[in-house]
């Protein structure tokens, strides 16, 4: 499929929140129980045809969440069209790290569209409520917040499609 649009999208957030699992679910439709820790960054591509009829190539940059790799993120952000910042809804400490991820991305990529992603909805003991994350997303000038689960495939494809549509919208505004 030849793509009308090609977008570089950063996927960032604390270690262990499920960034790689979300990308794997979206790109291949599968969920692996055993994920190896991402070292630096991994790159995946997904070609999609949106319900609008447009062909989009999503270049997904899965960035390691561990503190020791964070200094690299600024370089990976350059040229990004959009970003997902992920947190684990069962671990409040990952939600508390959102301001740092936002700062790094905005300092290096500007005011690109960002979607906050609360992953692991399939698990019990949610420590972050949807309304809290929605308020944070609004105050941080993010496009939206999405609660999802890579494991049970809840809201994964819709959040990536929403990002693609927003990126096309903003690209058309810039023309």
Task: Describe the role of every protein-language-model region.
Residues 1-175:
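TRAFAC-class small GTPase G-domain
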């Amino acid at each position: 499929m030849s793509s009308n649009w090609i977008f570089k999208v950063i996927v960032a957030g604390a270690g262990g929140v499920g960034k790689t699992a979300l990308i794997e679910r979206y790109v291949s439709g599968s969920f692996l129980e055993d994920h190896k820790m991402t070292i630096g960054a991994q790159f995946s591509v997904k070609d999609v045809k949106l319900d609008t009829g447009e062909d989009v190539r999503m270049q997904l940059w899965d960035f390691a969440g561990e503190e020791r790799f964070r200094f690299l993120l600024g370089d990976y952000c350059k040229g990004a069209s959009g970003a997902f910042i992920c947190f684990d809804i069962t671990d409040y400490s990952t939600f508390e790290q959102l301001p740092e991820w936002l700062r790094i991305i905005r300092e290096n990529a500007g005011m690109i569209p960002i979607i906050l992603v609360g992953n692991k909805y399939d698990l019990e003991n949610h420590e972050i409520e949807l309304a809290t994350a929605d308020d944070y997303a609004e105050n941080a000038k993010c496009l939206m917040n999405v609660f999802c689960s890579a494991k049970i495939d809840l809201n994964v494809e819709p959040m990536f499609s929403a990002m693609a549509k927003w990126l096309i919208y903003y690209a058309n505004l810039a023309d």
